[in-house]
């Protein structure tokens, strides 16, 4: 998370910074490591506040996932729950139930990029 914070600090206005915290999925979710997943969530919760403190006026932070993965579920496949979408910064507000295309649209609008039809 420290490296991500450095990237956010040095990002040019109008740029996109992307991070994938794959360990939630690969190390804990699919391996059904409940205690490891809990520790990772507690770490992330503590660190994300620091990152949010680095946001500048006009920045947008979007947190989401490509799927849910309940580490208490039997087996190693993806589970049925929806993925959260959390937004902070410019343009943040109540989104309701949305899909991946809506997340892409939110980011595209923020960056001033037209969405294809």
Residue ranges: model-predicted function:
Residues 1-117:
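Feature captures the catalytic ectodomains and active-site-proximal regions of enzymes
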């Amino acid at each position: 998370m420290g490296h991500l914070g450095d990237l956010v600090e040095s990002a040019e206005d109008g740029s996109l910074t992307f991070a994938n915290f794959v360990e939630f999925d690969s190390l804990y979710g699919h391996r059904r490591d409940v205690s490891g997943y809990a520790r990772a969530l507690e770490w992330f919760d503590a660190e994300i506040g620091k990152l949010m403190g680095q946001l500048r006026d006009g920045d947008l932070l979007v947190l989401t996932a490509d799927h849910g993965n309940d580490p208490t579920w039997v087996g190693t496949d993806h589970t049925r729950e929806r993925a959260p979408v959390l937004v902070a910064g410019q343009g943040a507000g109540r989104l309701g139930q949305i899909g991946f295309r809506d997340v892409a649209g939110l980011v595209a609008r923020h960056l001033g990029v037209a969405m294809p039809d």
